[in-house]
């Protein structure tokens, strides 16, 4: 009999299991694939490994502006993929060691919830049953493959791919068409453009990067176009196959030729086939319904990570797993989704937290904004010839509180956590003005912007 059974060994699952085991709960993790989930095996870490190689290669192409001569540099894609695999293997091994050290049991099988009785929940894995007083569902998400004519056949035949397959592609395609201009699509477009592909992104919306603040999105688009990525916006893909992607734009059918196609229009919670119906867990649009305490509709069952369909970010999953464990032990911790930062690891990087200009307008929030060039930072100027990065602040007029911060430029991913804390703690502009930021850094532009709002 276990105190806690965790279904899924991704960021939410393995982190929660480690925390629970350290707190004295007899814990079992059931994971049918590799520990680390999508993030470590086919998402966050693999893509960042590829993108770092691309960033170094891009620097060699523009080294002349900094007095560095790098004639004849090239990117060895096969080597990059091999290094990616080594990084993933090292980190998955680390997770296994962490769980073992914490005292959590791990079984490399998928778990299916069979039912509940007076003792707790029954979960089956590979024909064997396990009992748990509590359940934490962290089964993650799957890449969405929409019902576009020819798409499923193209995926089966290898012409089209999801994020899982493209990360292991052995060669760089001459022409890559990306369906979807969200985070995954943009990051892969960035890498393969650097690697030598002729990249075209087809996006149904009239902008890229989804809910990213519009001003930031436009700057990112400009940088991508300058790099050589072609964008077809406001277009709906209608057919995939025979070496091309057919789309409809402004009422006209057009097409773009491709050697490979990446499908990246989003993800859906993995809730099918795990036995939710056997215990009555409520779902909505395929995702498990949870509250801010990570509770499901069934007492004794919590859910964390992509499976709840909320944020679908690994760092959100970490926190949700921790909140679930704390609350199953009597705590009252909650997840504040508005203060969770997001990052697009392109070159330049994009990082955001809180409200955008579009969201405050939609919610009717009286807000004021300030957009400040990163050229106020001496370090940014020293490291960026012709850089167009900015930081944008959004402040509610009534209380003069910081409710949104958005950046595009070097180090944005490493700076945004500080802005997230400001938003989380509902800091006022005058409070932040009193902070002393190190100089010369890029982050000090946030403080400078406070004096301009």
Where are these regions (language model features)?
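Beta1/beta-strand and adjacent pyrophosphate-binding region of the FAD-binding site
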Residues: 1-12, 172-182
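FAD-site-proximal beta/loop scaffold in flavoenzymes
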Residues: 153-172, 255-327
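Gly/Ala-rich phosphate-binding loop of Rossmann-like dinucleotide-binding domains
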Residues: 17, 21, 189, 193-194
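Flexible, glycine-rich terminal cap/loop adjacent to redox cofactors
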Residues: 7-10, 15-33, 38, 45, ...
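Glycine-rich flavin
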Residues: 2, 18-25, 30-172, 200, ...
């Amino acid at each position: 009999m276990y105190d806690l059974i965790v279904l899924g060994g991704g960021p939410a699952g393995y982190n929660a299991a480690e925390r629970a085991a350290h707190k004295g709960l007899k814990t079992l993790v059931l994971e049918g694939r590799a520990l680390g989930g999508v993030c470590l095996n086919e998402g966050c870490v693999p893509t960042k490994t590829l993108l770092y190689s691309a960033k170094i290669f891009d620097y060699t192409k523009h080294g002349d502006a900094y007095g560095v001569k790098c004639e004849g540099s090239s990117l060895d894609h096969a080597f990059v993929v091999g290094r990616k695999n080594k990084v993933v293997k090292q980190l998955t091994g680390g997770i296994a060691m962490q769980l073992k050290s914490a005292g959590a049991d791990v079984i490399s099988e998928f778990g299916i919830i069979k039912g509940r009785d007076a003792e707790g929940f029954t979960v089956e894995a590979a024909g064997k049953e396990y009992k748990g007083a509590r359940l934490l569902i962290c089964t993650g998400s799957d890449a969405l493959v929409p019902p576009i004519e020819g798409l499923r056949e193209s995926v089966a035949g290898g012409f089209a791919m999801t994020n899982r397959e493209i990360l292991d592609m052995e060669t760089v395609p001459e022409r890559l068409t990306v369906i979807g201009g969200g985070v995954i699509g943009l990051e892969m477009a960035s890498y393969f453009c650097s690697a030598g592909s002729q990249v075209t992104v087809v996006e149904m919306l009239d902008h890229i990067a989804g809910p990213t603040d519009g001003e930031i999105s436009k700057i990112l688009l400009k940088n991508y176009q300058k790099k050589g990525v072609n964008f077809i916006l406001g277009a709906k893909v209608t057919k995939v196959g025979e070496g091309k992607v057919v789309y409809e734009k402004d009422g006209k059918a057009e097409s773009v030729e491709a050697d490979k196609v990446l499908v990246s229009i989003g993800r859906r919670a993995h809730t099918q086939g795990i036995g939710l119906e056997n215990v009555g867990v409520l779902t909505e649009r395929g995702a498990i319904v949870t509250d801010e305490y990570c509770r499901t509709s069934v007492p004794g069952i919590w859910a964390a990570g992509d499976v709840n369909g909320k944020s679908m970010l690994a760092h959100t999953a970490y926190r949700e797993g921790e909140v679930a464990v704390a609350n199953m032990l009597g705590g009252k911790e909650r997840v504040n989704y508005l203060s969770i930062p997001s990052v697009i690891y392109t070159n330049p990087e994009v990082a955001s937290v809180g409200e955008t200009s579009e969201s405050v307008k939609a919610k009717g929030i009286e807000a004021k904004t300030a957009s400040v060039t990163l050229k106020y930072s001496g370090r940014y100027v020293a490291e960026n010839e012709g850089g167009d990065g900015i930081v944008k602040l959004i402040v509610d007029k009534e209380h003069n509180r910081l409710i949104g911060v958005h950046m595009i430029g070097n180090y944005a991913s490493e700076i945004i956590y500080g802005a997230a804390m400001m938003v989380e703690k509902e800091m006022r502009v005058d409070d932040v003005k009193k902070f002393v930021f190190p100089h010369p850094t890029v982050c000090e532009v946030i403080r400078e912007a406070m004096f301009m709002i």
